[in-house]
Amino acid sequence: MKFHLKRYVIVTSILLSFFLLFRRQFLPLTQRQPNPINNELVSFDLIKQRNKFENPIYAKWKLSSSSPLETDLTTRCNDYFQQLLTQENFQINYHDSGYKTEPFVYKRKKWLKERIRSLRKQYKFDKNKDKYDFDQIAKQEFSIVSKNQSIHELNIYQHFSHTRIFGKCFATNNNNNNNNGVINMENPQSNQLCKSFVQKLYPWMSGNLPIFERNKERSPPQLDDSTDCIIEQIYKNSKGKGKGIIIPLMTQDKSNNQIQNIGRLIKVLRGLNNTLPIEITFMELITPEAKQQLYDIATSDSQMYPTKQDIAFVDLSPTTTNQVKGSISDSSIITLSSIFTSFEEFIILNQHIIPLIELTKFFNNERYKLHGTYFFKSPSKLKYRTTKFNIGFHEIASFIKNQLIPNKFDKHYFNLYQKGSENGDEVTIDRFFNYQFNNLIDSSLIIFNKSKTLSGLLISGNFEFLYHDDLFNIRINNTPTKTKMDYLWLGQYISGINEQIIFNFNYAIMPGILTPSQNLPKDSIECLEICSSSWGQLSDIDDISLLYITSHQLQNWLNHQKFFESLLKDKYEFKFNELVDNFLITNTNTNTNTNTNTNGNTNDKDSTKLTMGRIDLSIFEKIKTQPLKIETIIRPPTLIEPINVLGYNEPDQAWVHQDDFDRIGQNGQGQGQGQGHPFYCVYSSIGDPLKEGIRGLSINVEQSLQKKYKKLIEIWLQD
């Protein structure tokens, strides 16, 4: 039995060895050895190749004997898109399902290192492995991969180039002293070309208009029989419709708090006697109960706030194709709301804002009137600056800045604006391109004129729906909050319709009540501090008038009051020493007020007094009665990096996140609903102001304004 078992093992081993030898010798050629090496190694530079990108129509026009500039804008636009339409195999592969950007393609050394390691592992048991030049094989493969990525980039470059011209021709009525004039959309060829290229350039658009509900009646979209182009329908539906307010319902907020916050905002609008009509936009179904709740708040009789609000609900879901509905984000809701609103000029308010002035005043800004946009800057928190970069981060930022913006041919043929350092918006935008900041925009309040910004809004839509998870995701979404508000200004930047993108000159500020000096950071003597979950914005006309604040502090108070109150108590109570009567000592000489020491000197201290430690709760009591009390405003310094304090015990940055408050809404803390909002402390000076530090500004709020703000905050807090 043992002999048979031993023989079985020997035979099995021989057969297995023979099988392995046979398998190695007779493998298919493609599996036995790598592809043959091309003796002439192709050297391909992905970044330098971008300098050769060219719009194909411009390339033809440059060689043409007749200049397109000799014709009017309508003829020139028709010629451009007619040539593009007849171009052989014209197609925008905007989202090739078979292609995905490999970020390491932008890091040649790392790509080659990993590929060589992989090849050596793959052919570890190949008897001819010593004959293979894995270095050369990897370089040849990298050249192929780089070329494929370059083709992908070229396709994106041409897509944005064509959309920019489309926007100039069909999606703007902004002359702005532009001597090219405005296209005649009554031209049948223009109408047909517009219709054809909407489907090619903006495939996320379904071709349908939103559904409006006014006075509890749904109204079908109003279509103009004179045009078949959805872009022209959008423009005509809002032309001459005046000004209004848009309040978007964010899809990522699934809590009922959103409806409550919007209801409170509408109450504040009534308190401000707002007369602008309101559109509440949404993508997902809003319940009839929520609609009724908001409708009642807006239109119910009130002796205290008699100005009823004109409110409509706008269902945006018909406007996009089913393929992109899964990629709806907060910023894309704002984009869609701006494109499909019935207003020509509009203010977008998010659920967290408390306006402090009449909203019609925002439209009076002269820079807005000229350029059609007005953004407020988000708080200049250093956490918005990227310090850990995705692979390809800088290469994609360079691609956006140098390839996607209007070039000299866009300027020459269509008088689109090139961006340069002489433009006022560049100082702000440099924070994105040169200092790696994200979230430049405070989404609390945004102002658009559709006739001047529709082209850029359509480009923002392409960013959102076509490239949201590929190339630009490497740069745009490299942020902890994963928000994409930068697409809103980038669309305007790339469109070239307006010479400037208008930002408020000031960055966000912190309104509130000063932290008592006893509770300031250790050894801080120069700075003032205000701590809150809310921020605000100042007018850039006088730099001191408060325009609006956010309600985050009040939401924390309402939704997590017990826990939030305990944290605020720790923050604002402070100890002080007080002289009190010492009842344990009986002094028979009540007329003696001084004592003489052994040296014959008198002591001023009364021996009948004791130093007693006290706790001062006066500031905390103010906050309990008014959770967002505005006595002072701090306009902190704007930084691009922390200040090296060099042993000087002052803050090294302007906005300091308070980690203790992050527990709000977690683990049942506060017995509230939903997640709490972050809590920050803001400082009026950073470092040593006499040396390397920077000083900001503190503003005392006058009593009359304090009363006004208190009234509006109380309106917001009302149930």
From Swiss-Prot:
One of its GO terms (cellular component) is Golgi membrane. It is a single-pass type II membrane protein. Its EC number is 2.4.1.-. It comes from the Eukaryota. Pfam families: Mannosyl_trans3. InterPro entries: Alpha_mannosyltransferase. Keywords: Glycoprotein, Glycosyltransferase, Golgi apparatus, Membrane, Signal-anchor, Transferase, Transmembrane, Transmembrane helix. Belongs to the MNN1/MNT family. Responsible for addition of the terminal mannose residues to the outer chain of core N-linked polysaccharides and to O-linked mannotriose. Implicated in late Golgi modifications. This is Putative alpha-1,3-mannosyltransferase MNT4. It comes from Candida albicans (strain SC5314 / ATCC MYA-2876) (Yeast).
